[in-house]
Structures are given as C-alpha cells and as structure tokens.
Amino acid sequence: PAFGFFSDNFRDTIKRTLVAGHRRESQHPANDFANILTANVGKVGPAHFTQPQQAIQYVECHDNATVFDYFQLEKEEIRLEERKALSRLALHLVLLAQGVPFIHAGQEFYRTKGLEENTYNLPDNLNQLDWTSLSKCKEEIAFLKELIAYRKSQPLLRLRKGQEIRDYCDLKWLSDHHFIYTIEKDRKKITILVNIGDQEMTYHQPNDSQLLFAYPQAKLQTSIPKGKELSLSAHSWILLYEGD
C-alpha cells in the first residue's frame, strides 16, 4: 500500500467516456465509472488496489497527447468551447475522485502540443509552456485553486481507507448521460452531479443542502431547499453539501 501507481484505467475511462458523451459499458471492473472515481478499491467487483493511496488519478502526463489536444484528435468537428468544457470536466474529475490527484503542468490553461501525441524528440516550441495563456484563463485558474483548496479541507473527498470508500461512497447513473456521485459519513454528505452529455439536464434535490460549486462559481454556499429543481448545463458538474 505504500506504493502508488498511475491509474491508466482512470485516464482512459474518463477520456473515452467524455468523448462519447454517454455511459460506456466495460467487461473489466477496473474500468467501471463507480470504481475509477472511488480509487478502484472494489466498490463494484474485485479490487484493483487495496488502499486509495495506491491510485494516482490522472488524465494527462508527459507522454501522449494533452487532454485538450486529445479531444480535438478524437473528435475533429469539435467546437472550441466544447473542447474546453470537456478538458475542464476531465481535470475537475481528477480532483473530485478518491485517491491521489495528479495534475500535469498547463492543464489549467488548456495546454496544447500542436496535436502531437509524443513530443519527447520534438523542439521546445511544442514542449514549452505558453505562459501568456495564464492571462486568458483567469476564470478557470481561479476556480481550480478554490477546488484544490476545498479538496484539501474536506475529508470526505480524501477518505484514507479502502473500506471507508466501499462503505461511504456511491455512484448511480440517472441516465446514459448523467450520474450522481455521493460520499456520506457521520451525518455529512457531498453530492456531485455530473452531466457528460451535450444537453442541459434538470435534477430535483431530495434534501435541504448548500450549493458550493457550479462552474465558474466556487464557494457559493447557496441554500437549496428540498425538492428544488436544479439545471445543469452540458459537460459540467455541481457539488452540493449537507451537514454542519
């Protein structure tokens, strides 16, 4: 349990599912969405890891195409705004999942390597970080900082034991395009609604709660009464909290 492993199952399942825009069935439990978001410790079927510290959750690292480029390569007709939204969603899911998050430099400002998949032997103009992108992505970066800070402060997003994850986490698909991911422990509950489709969805929250995250807004603390209808735009997510 002291060693971590880059979770290719997380990487591939997230990217392929977001490209498809709908739920994808797999014969391998390690690729099940309920498992990849819960560090693959056996929420559904056999465990791939024994403890969450073993699961390095990522969608981008030094090899292969950047996430931003991946969506263009896989979906040539993709619009820029959709490409950005999918890239954000992939990155945010890394931070919402159990396990150890790994963020590659430049993901927060849609890093591109000119659609090249492997650039180890290519010049600096492809491998360098374009720092001018920072000024163009202030909203995305500010939101990401708040999400990272919230993850660090919220134990429910950082459960330490595999058994805790199996006991307290749950994921259900509401349709082929939407799922609800919950973590509930000691009268505290996080509900994360995710829309991977290209159409807006609505959801009725069954309990009184607080809306904390709804991109591009963070730390909202908006009271949501029981039964209120919530709208969730395409390729986005929201986080609700119940408890003290």
Language-model regions: role of each:
Residues P1-Y110, E116, Y120, C169, ...:
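Conserved alpha/beta catalytic core and glycan-binding cleft of carbohydrate-active enzymes
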Residues E81-K84, L95-I103, Q107-F109, K113-D244:
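Carbohydrate-interacting/catalytic domains
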